[in-house]
């Protein structure tokens, strides 16, 4: 069955890899060859902005500005697509994706994880669009011009988007960019709900699970999931062990837990809210699905859990495709 995965961190990992590896074939979790083998319709490739000088050193990468980093990764992304144009092509919206599929090609969407690069200047948002970016995760795990992230501290969770952050959400809705609330504070999430409802646009939690099954602050509460569904949005099931297991320190990611989250999501807010956001190449631990070509293993588990073929199709690609169609230009 074909699928759309709304989040992987593969591009970041290439900053650490040798020049002999590419998006066509590599030693990590996501490449075009295995995407094709698994039946991928589309993959969202995130440009994750490393959080500080220490993280650059830990990753073995020479520090650079956010825009130097974005330029470098986006150039590699587009170069690898051009070099493999028989297999895959860039998509900036639903029509692009469907045209690619009709031509026998997979689609690649470009995203940015951490909206700090906007730096209180809307021109930077527009510049990212010109580079092909169609989804932005508003925050990562630190404060930025848009707002605050998820944390255990109640005061931070209760902090709203900044006034500029609210303008960013409005502008993204206008431009045809998908707003992503994974990593955002709880209060910031509700601001996005209000703005997107007003604008008649869906949004996503590209790689988040349910807090009621795995009590990590990165996950959504039941009420958040329902509100997300009401806007026509969806959440991508994250394969990280600590976001699936009741024990947030767990180190084993189990397909049965993914199915439990999907089932509860369906029962709480309807099947239309459930999608995929693997977070491959951005997560650690013992992963039952450790490669993009193994994603269909989840569909087999959903069938065992009682999901119909139509429901599995919605999780695999239909729900994400609907949001792409409704949000992206």
Please give the residue ranges for each predicted region:
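Structural preference for beta-strand elements that scaffold enzyme active sites
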Residues: 2-5, 42, 89, 107-111, ...
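Glycine-rich tight-turn/loop motif centered on a GG-T
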Residues: 59-67, 149-167, 175-178, 209-221, ...
